[in-house]
């Protein structure tokens, strides 16, 4: 049995396909990325907030590490490689393979990462359970427009990620309908996916 994104499944969820038995189990995932989403505090307190993958790793079953990453520009991969993977990852792509996209005034053209501070504007979302920042959502819409107007990227090449469901709604409200091919999701909703450019609203 193969279970993909196994680190996002709680232990009980991962055990369901094993009920009838299996000679071999292959769990595919990364226990250094997002853990399973557990809404119930009681379930979390009961230890149901981790994956079978994580438990087996803690018990000493050594996961096999895929050492070459092909997704990110080397300047972007440097942080997670050093912080989470003890500098064990190698870049299978070069800066030339992942050129800096036109459409933004990059502080450093060779470093395709930019932080844009947006002052104020954070409020509770109308549902009361999340946060949103309409000012930041408007900035995201402007950045998106600049990237697409430059002509190098298609809508499908750009993703917008935010930790908050309320901010997902605020961004969708700010982005013109003509850009409905751009995916806007929460961090959990983007796990395992990739785009040429990610705009992160936090």
Q: Where in this protein do the model-derived segments appear?
A:
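Conserved helicase motor core of SF1/SF2 NTP-dependent helicases
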Residues: 1-202
């Amino acid at each position: 049995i193969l279970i993909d994104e196994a680190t996002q499944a709680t232990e009980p969820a991962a055990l369901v396909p094993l009920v009838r038995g299996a000679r071999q189990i292959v769990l595919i995932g990364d226990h250094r990325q997002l853990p399973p989403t557990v809404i119930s505090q009681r379930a979390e307190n009961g230890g149901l907030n981790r994956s079978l993958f994580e438990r087996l790793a803690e018990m000493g079953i050594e996961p096999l590490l895929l050492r070459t990453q092909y997704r990110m520009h080397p300047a972007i991969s440097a942080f997670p490689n050093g912080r989470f993977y003890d500098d064990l990852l190698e870049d299978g792509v070069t800066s030339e393979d992942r050129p800096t996209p036109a459409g933004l005034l990059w502080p450093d053209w060779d470093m395709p990462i930019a932080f844009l501070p947006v002052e104020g504007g954070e409020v509770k979302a109308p549902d009361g359970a999340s946060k949103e920042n309409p000012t930041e959502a408007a900035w995201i819409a402007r950045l998106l427009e600049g990237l697409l107007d430059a002509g190098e990227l298609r809508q499908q090449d750009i993703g917008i990620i935010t930790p908050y469901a309320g901010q997902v709604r605020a961004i969708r409200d700010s982005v013109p309908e003509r850009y409905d091919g751009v995916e806007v999701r929460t961090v959990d909703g983007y796990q395992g996916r990739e785009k040429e450019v990610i705009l992160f609203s936090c």
